[in-house]
Structure formats: C-alpha cells, structure tokens
Amino acid sequence: MTNIRKSHPLIKIINDAFIDLPAPSNISSWWNFGSLLGVCLAVQILTGLFLAMHYTSDTATAFNSVTHICRDVNYGWLLRYLHANGASMFFICLYLHVGRGLYYGSYTYTETWNVGIILLFAVMATAFMGYVLPWGQMSFWGATVITNLLFAIPYIGTDLVEWIWGGFSVDKATLT
C-alpha cells in the first residue's frame, strides 16, 4: 500500500516541497532566515500599505490619525502592532542571517557577500528614513543624533549634514 502523502495529488505537492525536499541532510535551521526575511518583508510592505491609507503626516493631526487607526479601523491595532514588531523581527532575522554567513564562511564568495553588504546598507538606510519621517518629536531626535554622525567626515561633513537636513536644522516633526 502506498503512502497517501506520496500518492494524493494535492498532498504530494506539499510533501515534495516540505518533507522530501531535495536538500542536503546536514542543512540546519540557520538556513531558514533568508526565507523568514522574505516573510517579514512581505508583512512589512502589506501592513505599511494598509496603515498608510489612514495615516496623516501633518504635525497637528498625526497622533489623531494613529488613534483613528487603532480604534476605528477593523483590526487597525493588529496592523499597527504587526508593523512595529515585524520591523524588529525583520532585523533580528537579518542579523542572524548575516551571522550565519559569517559562521559558515560565506564571506569567501566575495561577489555574493558584497551584494549582501550593499543590501544591508540599503535596508538600514530605508529603516532610518522610516524612523525619521513620521514619528513626531522622536524623529527630531533621531534625525539630529544619527545624521550628526556625518559631521565626523573630514572636509565635507558639515555640507553633507546640511544637504541631508535641507538647511541648518531639522524643520518639522514630519515632512509636510
């Protein structure tokens, strides 16, 4: 008698993808973090789109729009918490993914490793922009402290910071 997971047409697809996956037997759970990064990124994009439908970035109404999302939108509180905690999970998975690469010596593949480093910097820059733009007074602090690190660059640091800020100081709590 044949096993149902190998004979049933629908269960066979799941069996081939998850149970009898043609992968080496010595692969460990450390190799899941790339897939988890994809899941976290998809959750971030979807929840971010739904939150952006109700968010107002004006300094006078930003807090009211967040309370509207949490109170009046169906499962708005869940979207907000998934988005906030999903960002933390994304970076945890990202750092574990890099740590796995360091542990297994993936840095010897220089082209692949350099692409990963560029992606890491792009993710950090994107996260910085997401942190700085909408959050009110916390973004004043974040923008000032983090971008002031650029002042340490010799000769161009001052001009670079003023270019990023768009002037001599950060103007408002949000971009509007």
From Swiss-Prot:
Pfam families registered for this protein in UniProt: Cytochrome_B (PF00033)
Similarity comment: family membership: Belongs to the cytochrome b family.
Domain of life: Eukaryota
Cofactor(s) it depends on: heme b
GO biological process: mitochondrial electron transport, ubiquinol to cytochrome c
GO CC annotation terms, alphabetical: mitochondrial inner membrane
Annotated heme b b562 binding sites: H83
Cofactor: how and how many bound: Binds 2 heme b groups non-covalently.
Keywords: Electron transport, Heme, Iron, Membrane, Metal-binding, Mitochondrion, Mitochondrion inner membrane, Respiratory chain, Transmembrane, Transmembrane helix, Transport, Ubiquinone
Function comment: Component of the ubiquinol-cytochrome c reductase complex (complex III or cytochrome b-c1 complex) that is part of the mitochondrial respiratory chain. The b-c1 complex mediates electron transfer from ubiquinol to cytochrome c. Contributes to the generation of a proton gradient across the mitochondrial membrane that is then used for ATP synthesis.
Protein name from the UniProt record: Cytochrome b
Quaternary structure note: The cytochrome bc1 complex contains 11 subunits: 3 respiratory subunits (MT-CYB, CYC1 and UQCRFS1), 2 core proteins (UQCRC1 and UQCRC2) and 6 low-molecular weight proteins (UQCRH/QCR6, UQCRB/QCR7, UQCRQ/QCR8, UQCR10/QCR9, UQCR11/QCR10 and a cleavage product of UQCRFS1). This cytochrome bc1 complex then forms a dimer.
